[in-house]
Design a protein with these regions (language model features):
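Start-of-helix register in tetratricopeptide repeats
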Residues: 9, 41-44, 75, 108-111, ...
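TPR/TPR-like (Sel1-like) alpha-helical repeat modules
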Residues: 35-38, 100-102, 121-144, 151, ...
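Short coil turns that delineate tetratricopeptide repeat
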Residues: 5, 37-39, 71, 105-107, ...
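Canonical tetratricopeptide repeat
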Residues: 13, 45-48, 79-82, 115, ...
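Register position in tetratricopeptide repeats
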Residues: 20-21, 52-53, 86-87, 119-122, ...
């Protein structure tokens, strides 16, 4: 390809093309030149290059630079979330993923939702996972793996719901009994050893 020019945009564009061609060393060279000329988008592109090279530490640095520049988008937030997920830091990942899905222009809603479901499950927030999976299967009914996840979470929610209702009922019954006891009866029950 033949893209001439020495502006930050020219370097960033060439770096992006090299990235797509799998020529990561050339991509880094061009993108570092773009960064030297204060290209914000070059942070995103070079982060993707590092990620493709299996270097999540450097990728995270450049994704974070991109986010800190105020130019963050849902793709960058998802990428940062996935880096945290790979580290096993699911609560940290949720921070990025939730910010990403809350953005005005979300270009990767499906990926964000999939990652949110995973993170909510790993952090034992099954109610949130259930809410997202319901929305997900409505939006993407052809996704067979999401259908299985839906069934799993539905069964989990049904299994935990009766236990919660039973506990509430026992608490309400206990309160009703306590309300009808005289102070002497209540004291007698407290002094009686459990069998």
């Amino acid at each position: 390809f033949d893209i001439k020019g020495n502006s930050a945009g020219d370097y960033a564009w060439r770096g992006r093309i090299y990235y797509y061609l799998g020529q990561y060393d050339n991509a880094q060279t061009e993108l570092k030149s773009a960064l030297d000329k204060e290209s914000v988008i070059a942070n995103l592109y070079i982060a993707q290059v590092y990620e493709a090279q299996g270097d999540p530490e450097n990728a995270e640095v450049y994704y974070q630079n991109y986010v800190n520049s105020g130019s963050a988008d849902s793709e960058a937030m998802n990428a940062l979330g996935e880096i945290e997920m790979a580290k096993g830091n699911y609560s940290g990942a949720l921070t990025y993923l939730e910010q990403g899905i809350a953005m005005e222009n979300v270009t990767n809603r499906r990926e964000l939702m999939q990652n949110l479901i995973i993170c909510y499950e790993y952090t034992s927030d099954f109610n949130s996972a259930w809410n997202i999976v319901q929305e997900y299967v409505q939006a993407y009914p052809e996704d067979a793996s999401a259908q299985r996840e839906y069934i799993f979470l539905k069964n989990r929610m049904e299994q935990t719901a009766p236990a919660e209702n039973t506990e509430e009922a026992v608490t309400e019954d206990t309160q009703a009994v306590e309300d009808t006891q005289t102070p002497e009866e209540a004291q007698t029950l407290e002094d009686t050893p459990a069998q």
